[in-house]
Swiss-Prot record:
Residues recorded as bearing Cysteine methyl ester in the entry: 186
EC number: 3.6.5.2
Means of activity regulation: Alternates between an inactive form bound to GDP and an active form bound to GTP. Activated by a guanine nucleotide-exchange factor (GEF) and inactivated by a GTPase-activating protein (GAP).
Assigned protein family: Belongs to the small GTPase superfamily. Ras family.
Gene: HRAS
Biological processes, Gene Ontology terms: adipose tissue development; cellular response to gamma radiation; defense response to protozoan; endocytosis; fibroblast proliferation; insulin receptor signaling pathway; intrinsic apoptotic signaling pathway; myelination
Organism lineage string: Eukaryota, Metazoa, Chordata, Craniata, Vertebrata
Keywords: Acetylation, Cell membrane, Golgi apparatus, GTP-binding, Hydrolase, Lipoprotein, Membrane, Methylation, Nucleotide-binding, Palmitate, Prenylation, Proto-oncogene, S-nitrosylation
Protein name listed in UniProt: GTPase HRas
Length: 189
């Protein structure tokens, strides 16, 4: 069974733990209890493949930022979460993405941008803004509500699909030998 190491990142209070607990336990946690670091495991079937999700729910608070490099090194894919009613959390996504790219030493890291709390009427980040940001990063964007469960599975499962595609790209890199080459090999004897 394939195991996927997923890391949930984002500013404090955006609902990272609520999303994770909703996926794992089908339960909405409405009281805010800042996370230092929690790990969850769940066996799921995605596109016909049984797999084990190893999800690391991380601290959003700045005082725990020193711990980020460590979990970013071990993660295979990242849910970058902001709250649609918190513009600052949306602006913070850029810092998380840059730190992930730096720690992974790669521009090609599986990520999904997640706009959480879409059940709330007081939106300050428009869907179009988030879609544009995700497009500029070349990653999917999904709106979620940990409260209603909307988009929760979709966000995590899309990240697994991104990791799968990333692994395939690494196994079969695009042919860089030029436009005229048809992958022919010449043998001179």
């Amino acid at each position: 069974m394939t195991e996927y190491k997923l890391v949930v990142v984002g500013a404090g209070g955006v609902g990272k733990s609520a999303l994770t607990i909703q996926l794992i336990q089908n339960h909405f946690v409405d009281e805010y209890d800042p996370t230092i670091e929690d790990s969850y495991r769940k066996q799921v079937v995605i596109d016909g493949e049984t797999c084990l999700l190893d999800i690391l729910d991380t601290a959003g608070q700045e005082e725990y930022s020193a711990m980020r490099d460590q979990y970013m090194r071990t993660g295979e894919g990242f849910l970058c979460v902001f709250a649609i009613n918190n513009t600052k959390s949306f602006e913070d996504i850029h810092q998380y993405r840059e730190q992930i790219k730096r720690v992974k030493d790669s521009d090609d890291v599986p990520m999904v941008l997640v706009g959480n709390k879409c059940d709330l009427p007081a939106r300050t980040v428009e869907t179009r803004q988030a879609q544009d940001l995700a497009r500029s990063y070349g990653i999917p964007y999904i709106e979620t509500s940990a409260k209603t469960r909307q988009g929760v599975e979709d966000a995590f499962y899309t990240l697994v699909r991104e990791i799968r595609q990333h692994k395939l790209r690494k196994l079969n890199p695009p042919d860089e030998s030029g436009p005229g080459c048809m992958n022919c090999k010449c043998v001179i004897s």
